[in-house]
Amino acid sequence: MPVGIIINALSIVIGGILGAFAGHKLSPKFKEDITLVFGVCSMGMGISTIGLMENMPAVIFSIVIGTGIGLAIHLGERINAGAGAMQRVIGKFIRNSNSEFSEDEFMNTLVTIIVLFCASGTGIYGSIVSGMSGDHSVLISKSILDLFTAAIFACSLGMVVCMIAIPQVIIFLILFFAATAIFPLTTPGMINDFKACGGFLMLATGFRMVKLKNFPTADMIPAMVLIMPMSWFWVTYILPLVS
């Protein structure tokens, strides 16, 4: 059962409601500082899972080649375009009622949070791990961050933030059930290398959140596809030759 996905979606809805009704009481400094804490939490989650790595060369190769593929096909731009399409659908139901934003600023911010909630490396990784192993801890930890992130964005955008839970659930459920089908073909070593690869994405996401370095996290997503085949290939063919 996709418990983590359900909890994550509910956290966005609850955060959106709280932010829309009570967000005006939060100071700009509070919003900025709490976002920095979110970044540190993401880094900590990443570091903890990187420690599970069993085949470092396979993980590093997957991250480098996967990111190269993502950059070559402009995956980040395509994800933004997809978010723009979602934004147009959502915008038909809820319009900008906040005078602080122009219509363009409202739509651009909405696209940003659609990408953040629906296409982040942490969410994709957490959904796949949840489907493969039943471990919902990544998504539950992400839910805590998303609760407050949704509240902060809802301070400015209003109730529209709650609606982002709908496309998020659809995307994460597809990943969850696909991972469930793949799991019988995996080994414990492949799973650990996959978790470590996801840890690098969470670490990069943390750096972005604290605005220390703008890593291309969306373009790093193909590494999540490469890592398990690469881990299997490394253990089966390369490791016997070098050991």
Predicted features by range, described:
Residues 231-243:
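Juxtamembrane boundary at the C-terminal end of a transmembrane helix
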Residues 207-226:
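Interfacial loop-to-transmembrane junctions
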Residues 98-163:
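Internal active-site segments that recognize and position negatively charged phosphoryl groups
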Residues 21-27, 48-53:
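Short, hydrophobic transmembrane alpha-helix segments
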Residues 1-14, 61, 127, 131-144, ...:
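Structural signature of hydrophobic alpha-helical transmembrane segments
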Residues 27, 74-83, 162, 216-217:
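Juxtamembrane/interfacial segments flanking transmembrane helices
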Residues 7-15, 19, 23, 39-40, ...:
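Alpha-helical transmembrane segments in multi-pass membrane proteins
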